């Protein structure tokens, strides 16, 4: 009998992109929320705020910083680690050892966008170690085509400057 996944867990490291935000006021949740906001935004877009909130309350969806994964064994789950280029080798090892029975993991990241102060990304390291192992796959996306880039730049210019003469 195939077991169903009981929950979806989304996580990412709490690493700032280039600039230091410094002290954040509030409780622990309000301190980590800014790092998790992109995950919340994506879920709101896919599910709608009300449906997302219901799934969160039922425990079907969990969004947590990577640091909260230590010590857990995650069975019957589908786990997504986002921005994995910003994990250290130690964090990546900790994350991968959370894998429990009937669990699938998806790890996303771009090794050209590392924000770590010590630029040894756990993502780049695991690819060298795990490449070629059965049931583990790595997918590399190609950069956007030059034609798309021109389209994007032109669309942005039109959007930005449209209406400037209306003043």
Task: Locate each region found by the language model.
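Conserved helicase motor core of SF1/SF2 NTP-dependent helicases
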Residues: 1-81, 85-167
């Amino acid at each position: 009998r195939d077991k169903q996944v009981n929950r979806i867990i989304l996580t990412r490291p709490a690493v700032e992109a280039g600039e230091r935000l410094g002290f954040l006021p509030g409780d622990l949740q309000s301190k980590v929320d800014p790092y998790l906001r992109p995950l919340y935004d994506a879920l709101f877009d896919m599910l709608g705020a009300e449906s997302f909130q219901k799934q969160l309350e039922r425990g079907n969806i969990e969004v947590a910083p990577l640091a909260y994964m230590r010590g857990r064994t995650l069975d019957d789950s589908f786990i997504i680690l986002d921005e994995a280029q910003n994990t250290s080798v130690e964090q990546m090892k900790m994350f991968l050892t959370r894998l429990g029975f009937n669990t699938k993991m998806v790890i996303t990241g771009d090794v050209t966008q590392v924000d770590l102060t010590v630029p040894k990304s756990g993502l780049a390291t695991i690819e060298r170690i795990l490449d070629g192992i059965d049931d583990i796959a790595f997918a590399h996306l190609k950069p956007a085509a030059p034609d798309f880039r021109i389209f994007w730049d032109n669309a942005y210019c039109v959007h930005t400057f449209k209406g400037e003469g209306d003043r």
